[in-house]
A protein has these predicted regions:
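Bacterial Sec-dependent N-terminal signal peptides
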Residues: 1-26
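Mature catalytic domains of secreted/periplasmic carbohydrate-active enzymes
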Residues: 25-520
Length: 520
């Protein structure tokens, strides 16, 4: 092997850096209009390759139900629902919310013990950024980060834009600590923002009155319950916090929750142009995820909460989901690793990615059940990652009896899906390599009908088939009824099973130079 001499290596690095700098300078800055922003590569390759990310819902509101059976109480929305007394802030049934009842018993009337007092009790002794990042990496995630600001207007970083932050109340900067540890693991860093809804979130608090004007920087300025029009101060504060996080932490991805679609188009365009231009300045491809109609699929990445399309989409998309509640909830029921792996496989087959939530304990430690779940997912991905990471949709996404009856938000809540061993999902690595993922353990032979010699979906000869994680020789035959794979003696995992299908490659006949071949 010929070693590169030091001057040559230095010259190579110099040329590479200068080339990258020139390329970044040659790209036109984005302007605050849709036409300009549509020139962005809204789904960079790193995002399309990643397939799996993690964020964590943790903050002062996590302590609201500590030691209590929450039943149907809202956790993350406690700062809003705690003021719903059924009278001043009515409900259709005329009764107070479960949150109001619980809060009154635990803390006293919310007019006397408001949300700001919950913030003042924020406990962070269990938070360990290195442990979080180690676990995220073990799970197989390729990007991760905190919920930087939820509906409660509380900054999970050392903010100068708001005094309501984790350094002033908690003594830590989780965003800085997580960025350092997450990037040290080779993962991309993200932050999520939910504070567009803050205007509606704290409207019930204002209905009760008595808020000290000096605390309007938390609760927003007084406004009516039915107000959907934030004032100028709200827009100024919303942008200042978001801009500060971008400037200080240089995230690879910004994810937005709903209600941003109700803010002005001007404010949304201002963000997109600023953040994408920052990406040019940092010389890295950044990404934005959104819900509803906030942006367009040519300017950012569409997200589906606890849902997904029932067919593949041309543009990459994202599902944000949680194995249990979004925030800590005692006694919460969690999805199994098997369920989450199946959801991930179905998502990836349709050109999507999964953003999985982790709900830490109130003190910032991660529950053992969540840790076990993530390690199990990581073990599956360690074996089957070739069928997930860096793949693209095949010509069809799958076959089998189990399909989503509809696509969109919250379909996971509407329909209980249990995939069977006759459900197959496909992913593609290249023109000569794709994967058939069997969603449950086969009992006998596996028949993939899509690959029948009669259908014509596959226009290449199969060279070999392998089961990921196994050294066993796989026996197979392609017939009129489909690709028939004999079940191996043992499977390397307990969940979905990925078969690598290696192809000869598509070739076309050439006419050649024989004159006779060209005669009609």
């Amino acid at each position: 092997m010929r070693l590169i001499k030091r001057p040559s290596l230095f010259l190579f690095i110099l040329v590479f850096c200068v080339s990258n700098y020139i390329n970044s300078q040659n790209r036109e800055p984005f302007k605050e209009n849709w036409k300009s922003i549509e020139a962005v590569n809204q789904a960079p390759d790193w995002f399309k390759d990643a397939k799996f990310g993690i964020y964590a819902h943790w903050g002062p509101v996590s302590s609201a139900f500590e030691g209590a059976d929450p039943d149907k109480w809202y956790a993350g929305w406690h700062g809003m629902k705690m003021y719903v007394d059924g009278k001043i802030v009515p409900q259709p049934n005329g009764k107070p919310s479960n949150n109001f009842v619980h809060h009154s018993k635990k803390y006293g009337h919310p007019k006397d013990f408001g949300y700001k007092h919950i913030i003042e009790q924020f406990e962070t002794t269990g938070f360990d950024a290195k442990k979080w990042a180690d676990l995220f990496a073990k799970s197989g995630a390729k990007f991760a980060g905190p919920v930087a600001m939820h509906h409660d207007n509380f900054a999970m970083w050392d903010s100068k834009a708001t005094r309501w932050n984790s350094m002033n109340y908690g003594g830590i900067d989780p965003s800085a600590a997580l960025k350092k540890e997450i990037e040290a693991k080779g993962l991309k860093f993200m932050g999520s923002f939910h504070h567009a809804f803050t205007w509606k979130y704290f409207a019930p608090a204002h209905a009760h009155g008595g808020i000290d004007p000096k605390d309007y920087d938390l609760y927003t300025n007084p406004h009516a319950l039915d107000s959907d029009t934030p004032d100028a101060q709200f827009y100024e504060d919303w942008w200042a916090k978001l801009k500060e996080f971008i400037d200080v932490y240089q995230p690879d991805l910004i994810w937005f929750d709903w209600w941003l679609e109700n803010m002005t188009e001007e404010s949304r365009l201002k963000f997109l142009a600023y953040y994408y231009n920052k990406g040019l300045e940092w010389n890295k491809d950044v990404a934005v995820c959104y819900k509803e109609t906030t942006f367009t699929e040519t300017t950012a990445i569409k997200d589906y909460e606890r849902g997904r399309p029932n067919q593949p989409k041309e543009n990459p998309w994202l599902t944000d989901t949680s194995p249990g509640a979004w925030f800590y909830r005692p006694g919460a029921q969690f999805k199994s690793p098997n369920e989450l792996v199946d959801i991930l496989v179905d998502i990836v087959s349709k050109n999507g990615l999964m953003l999985l939530n982790v709900p830490p304990n109130p003190d910032g430690s991660i529950p053992q059940v969540m840790e076990d779940l993530l390690i199990d997912m990581g073990a599956w991905l360690n074996i089957n990652g070739d069928a997930i990471y860096g793949t693209r949709p095949w010509i069809v996404f799958g076959e089998g009896p189990t399909r989503l009856p509809e696509g969109g938000h919250k379909v996971e809540d509407k329909v209980k899906i249990a995939y069977k061993n006759t459900d197959i999902r496909f992913t593609k690595k290249s023109d000569k390599e794709f994967f058939a993922i069997v969603m449950d353990k086969p009992e006998n032979e596996i028949v993939i009908k899509t690959l029948s010699t009669e259908i014509g979906a596959l226009n290449s000869r199969i060279l070999k088939i392998e089961l990921l994680g196994s050294n066993e020789t796989i026996k197979w035959e392609r017939t009129k009824k489909g690709l028939v794979i004999q079940s191996p003696k043992a499977f390397p995992t307990d969940y979905a099973h990925a078969f690598r299908i290696v192809l000869e490659g598509y070739t076309e006949n050439n006419i050649g130079g024989d004159v006779g071949a060209h005669e009609d």
